[in-house]
Design a protein with these regions (language model features):
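Active-site nucleotide-sugar/metal-binding loop of Leloir-type enzymes
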Residues: 7-18
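Short beta-strand-to-loop acidic/aromatic patch adjacent to the donor-nucleotide binding site
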Residues: 17-27
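Conserved donor NDP-sugar-binding/catalytic core segment of glycosyltransferases
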Residues: 27-62, 66, 138, 142
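Short, flexible, basic/aromatic active-site loop/helix in glycosyltransferases
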Residues: 50-56, 67-94, 103, 162, ...
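A conserved catalytic-core signature of glycosyltransferases
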Residues: 84, 88-98, 109, 115, ...
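Short, well-ordered alpha-helical scaffold segment located
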Residues: 100-104, 138
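Catalytic donor/gating beta->alpha subdomain of glycosyltransferases that bind UDP-sugars
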Residues: 109-172
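Alpha-helical bilayer-embedded segments of polytopic membrane proteins, i.e.
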Residues: 168-189
Length: 189
């Protein structure tokens, strides 16, 4: 999400009262930030985010996009499923944060190269703040274009998700453990 060494300083340089996470593979719609600010004000949440609307252009990318939006593909997180209702969430895709809440919990942890949002949302929730999902917020996401890039992405995501669990043991959930448990079970036979 953030280039190495930058994530920890983003919140200090933000000029306004919100900090928006942006991903190189995501395309925010023209009203994304305005809608997010309205949701922050209406809900009182510390972070709001929405649908990761995966769309591919090649057959491979379309297949990956279909897997991303399947309950079986990435575990059925609300931000992957278009029919998910608005409400509190463990995490959201490309959140828009209240700067004051971000600073109150120490901001993005620069020791995480990836999974900063998962880790930060954990700290926000455990400080009594709310993370809010709304399907009104939609980001077009462009999946990796080949098997090698996708495998590399998932490998690194898994490494950093494991680090979040090591740092915050009670953040482990079946959704994140299902894939590695399945792989180990298949390998053991």
């Amino acid at each position: 999400m953030h280039p190495a060494g930058v994530g920890g300083q983003v919140q200090e340089v933000a000029l306004l009262h919100v900090v928006a996470a942006v991903d190189a593979h995501g395309e925010l719609g023209p009203e994304y930030i305005a809608t997010a600010v309205e949701l922050l004000e209406r809900t009182g949440a510390a972070n709001v985010g929405g649908i990761m609307d995966a769309q591919g252009t090649t057959d491979f990318e379309k297949a990956v996009a279909a897997a991303y939006t399947s309950r079986l593909g990435l575990g059925g997180g609300s931000f992957h499923l278009k029919n998910s209702p608005e409400g509190p969430a463990d995490t959201v895709f490309l959140g828009v944060y209240r700067k004051a809440d971000l600073l109150a919990v120490g901001g993005f942890d620069p020791s995480f190269d990836r999974a900063q949002d998962w880790e930060l949302n954990y700290r926000l929730r455990h400080s009594g703040r709310e993370v809010w999902f709304s399907p009104r917020l939609k980001v077009t996401y462009r999946p990796r274009s080949d098997v090698k890039s996708l495998a590399t992405q998932f490998f690194h995501t898994g490494q950093w998700r494991r680090q979040v669990i090591r740092t915050h043991r009670d953040s482990a959930s079946l959704r994140y453990l299902a894939a590695p448990v399945t792989v180990v079970a298949c390998a053991v036979g």
